[in-house]
């Protein structure tokens, strides 16, 4: 006579339980691996909404510009992604154009915009909006080489 623990129903239940445990472990591992990217995306959500609103209606989010820059910087630090750097470049550009700053602070904002645009383009060089931001910053900073023309050409 067979022991009760080796009946077919018990073996099937044991296999099902082991598959459930394996699936649970796999889910935890995948969540742990995806957590930095997920956290960066959650931090970047308000920035993404503000950038999309700006492109739709043309009104810059001046009241929240510093907070949005901080969120974009934090997202890029958590997970370096082209969209985060491109959004940061746009926010610095808007700060330079619409901010009430002396010329030195305006120049610094354009330099930060150019640096963020360069980081974004290093990750994904096919974004015309970022090329245009780069060209505008280079033009304002009085770059006299062919780089400005090349940046404008890449934005078209």
What are these regions (language model features)?
Residues 74-75, 119-120, 155:
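Canonical positions in the second alpha-helix
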């Amino acid at each position: 006579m067979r022991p009760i623990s080796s009946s077919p129903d018990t073996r099937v239940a044991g296999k099902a339980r082991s598959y459930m445990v394996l699936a649970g472990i796999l889910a935890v591992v995948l969540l742990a691996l995806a957590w930095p990217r997920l956290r960066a995306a959650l931090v970047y959500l308000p920035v993404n909404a503000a950038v999309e609103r700006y492109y739709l209606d043309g009104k810059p989010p001046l009241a929240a510009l510093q907070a949005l820059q901080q969120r974009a910087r934090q997202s890029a630090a958590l997970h370096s992604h082209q969209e985060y750097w491109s959004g940061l470049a746009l926010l610095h550009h808007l700060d330079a154009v619409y901010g009430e700053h002396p010329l030195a602070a305006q120049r610094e904002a354009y330099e930060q915009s150019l640096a963020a645009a360069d980081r974004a383009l290093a990750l994904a060089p096919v974004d015309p909006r970022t090329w245009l931001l780069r060209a505008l910053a280079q033009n304002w900073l009085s770059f006299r080489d062919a780089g400005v023309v090349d940046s404008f050409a890449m934005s078209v």
